[in-house]
Amino acid sequence: MNECHYDKRMDFFYNRSNTDTADEWTGTKLVIVLCVGTFFCLFIFFSNSLVIAAVITNRKFHFPFYYLLANLAAADFFAGIAYVFLMFNTGPVSKTLTVNRWLLRQGLLDTSLTASLANLLVIAVERHMSIMRMRIHSNLTKKRVTLLILLVWAIAIFMGAVPTLGWNCLCNISACSSLAPIYSRSYLIFWTVSNLLAFFIMVVVYVRIYMYVKRKTNVLSPHTSGSISRRRAPMKLMKTVMTVLGAFVVCWTPGLVVLLLDGLNCKQCNVQHVKRWFLLLALLNSVMNPIIYSYKDEDMYNTMRKMICCAPHDSNAERHPSRIPSTIHSRSDTGSQYLEDSISQGQVCNKSSS
């Protein structure tokens, strides 16, 4: 029968796996790392709070897509909490942690990643429902959106707790990984493969939607009335989503590949030398998202700017021309029916020309 090591400190597992815990991070180097990390985390808290507040206060954002976008910002906010906890429980401190505290540290990171990933999957479903039905926004009710958000967090919390629930190597030391010394290599393989598979599915779905919208926009543009900005609104919304997805994949894929190599017990891969850089890259994803939201949507930018300047928000104010016009229209406008009406007009024009 295998001996279990629940009562050991983490130095026992780090020493067995020869894991680098950055003992050299002392003095000036440690202060610089903590200062830079603190700055990024404060920005994550501030900017993602603005995104959530903007969706709540501005009625132009009261659509399923933007509720889910706010939930993605909440996942980034949670990631900031996970990174703060990591900063003060890493380096030389890592070896002094108890098993439960280390599992909490890693569980927070796993939960934040799963929440972001699951939320992007839900957004993919919402976008597919709306675009394939010729609408800018889906007809999901607030109740259904709320249930989807709760489902996202339930899945995220469960996935973050799986190692704590038993899928670890505390009773089978020979199965321990190197980067995560009390995670089983089998769990790392499962976790990374499932995430990479989800990445692939999302990319396929979004590329399919993007190509569909682009094709429809190109076909309908010569035959439809209305401003160019309104005709291109669906494409602009998809570009925002694709930019967020692209940033997520670029920031997280390298780290997941390294974890997969560790799970496969690759001895020649030198995974220890790159782990901190890929963790920093993952941190930058939560920094980038609010910047993407505000840059790609003028209404989001204006709402966030007014909140920063403590200016009153007038939801009835006339919008100014934007560098990239917002994709949101009022409910009394043709926003939700725009694509459907455009197709009808295009068909009429085609018949007339024939």
Swiss-Prot record:
The organism's place on the tree of life at top rank: Eukaryota
One GO biological process term: positive regulation of MAPK cascade
Covalent lipid adducts (S-palmitoyl cysteine), residues: C309
Membrane topology note: Multi-pass membrane protein
UniProt key word Membrane: yes
All ranges on the Extracellular side of the membrane: 1-31, 89-101, 168-186, 262-276
Single GO molecular function: G protein-coupled receptor activity
Cytoplasmic side stretches: 53-67, 125-146, 208-240, 296-354
Glycosylated sites: N15, N172
Subcellular location: Cell membrane
Major site of localization recorded for this protein: membrane
Flavoprotein among keywords: no
Purpose: Receptor for lysophosphatidic acid (LPA), a mediator of diverse cellular activities. Seems to be coupled to the G(i)/G(o) and G(q) families of heteromeric G proteins.
Protein's UniProt name: Lysophosphatidic acid receptor 3
Species: Rattus norvegicus
Source taxonomy: Eukaryota, Metazoa, Chordata, Craniata, Vertebrata
Gene: Lpar3
